[in-house]
Structures are given as structure tokens and as C-alpha cells.
Amino acid sequence: MTIFNAVDKFTMMSGDRVKIKDLLSSRLTECGWRDEVRLLCRSILQEKGAISSFTVEQLVTEVTPRARSLVPDAVKKELLIKIRTIFDENEADDIDPEEA
């Protein structure tokens, strides 16, 4: 199991996945990332305008690497800190007071 899969499974089971997604969504909106990606999509669609068979899947494939690179480091760092905090809180909850 990869770290990504472990984090995904843990956050889903703990109920924190929604909190993390909400935090990410709000931060990406605040920093203008969503607007940048929207403009990027428009640009690609205009570029490919003559190709009527250009699919949504192809657009996603082309946009995804660029969109990921546009996520500000501060947002990535804040998300990582939030995930670590959730894990730390879970570890603290798992400690048996009689064993400590």
C-alpha cells in the first residue's frame, strides 16, 4: 500500500477526508488557482478548436500536470501540516493511558 493510499483510507475512515477536501478547495479558490486552471482549459480548447473529436478525458490528461504544478507551495505545506495533525491526534487517541 502506498502512502497516498494509506492516507486516503485513514482519512476516509476517520471522517477527516471531507475537512481536508474543504480546506483544499477553499485555499485553491482563495489563491486564484481555480481561475488559472479555468483559463488554461479555455486556452487549450481554443488551441484544439479545429479538432471536434477532442474529449473531456483528453483535456483532463493535458491539463492535470500543469494544474498540479500551479498549486502554490504554501497550500501544499498547509495541507501536509493538516494531514500530519490529524495523524498525530489519532495516535494520541490510540495511546492507552494505563500503558503510558
Curated annotation (Swiss-Prot):
Source taxon at top rank: Eukaryota
Keyword match Transport: yes
InterPro entries assigned to the protein according to its UniProt record, in alphabetical order: TF_ENY2, TF_EnY2_sf
Locations listed in the record: Nucleus, Nucleoplasm; Cytoplasm
Record has Protein transport as a keyword: yes
Gene Ontology MF: a single term: transcription coactivator activity
Pfam families reported for this sequence: EnY2 (PF10163)
Protein keywords: Activator, Chromatin regulator, Cytoplasm, mRNA transport, Nucleus, Protein transport, Transcription, Transcription regulation, Translocation, Transport
GO annotation, biological process: chromatin organization; mRNA export from nucleus; positive regulation of transcription by RNA polymerase II; protein transport; transcription elongation by RNA polymerase II
Main location per the UniProt record: nucleus
Transmembrane feature ranges: none
Example of a GO cellular component annotation carried by this entry: transcription export complex 2
Family: Belongs to the ENY2 family.
Record text on subunit structure and interactions: Component of the nuclear pore complex (NPC)-associated AMEX complex (anchoring and mRNA export complex), composed of at least e(y)2 and xmas-2. Component of the SAGA transcription coactivator-HAT complexes, at least composed of Ada2b, e(y)2, Pcaf/Gcn5, Taf10 and Nipped-A/Trrap. Within the SAGA complex, e(y)2, Sgf11, and not/nonstop form an additional subcomplex of SAGA called the DUB module (deubiquitination module). Component of the THO complex, composed of at least e(y)2, HPR1, THO2, THOC5, THOC6 and THOC7. Interacts with e(y)1. Interacts with su(Hw) (via zinc fingers).
Family annotation (PANTHER family): ENHANCER OF YELLOW 2 TRANSCRIPTION FACTOR (PTHR12514)
Function: Involved in mRNA export coupled transcription activation by association with both the AMEX and the SAGA complexes. The SAGA complex is a multiprotein complex that activates transcription by remodeling chromatin and mediating histone acetylation and deubiquitination. Within the SAGA complex, participates in a subcomplex that specifically deubiquitinates histone H2B. The SAGA complex is recruited to specific gene promoters by activators, where it is required for transcription. Required for nuclear receptor-mediated transactivation.
Protein name (database record): Enhancer of yellow 2 transcription factor
Naturally occurring in which organism (per UniProt): Drosophila pseudoobscura pseudoobscura (Fruit fly)
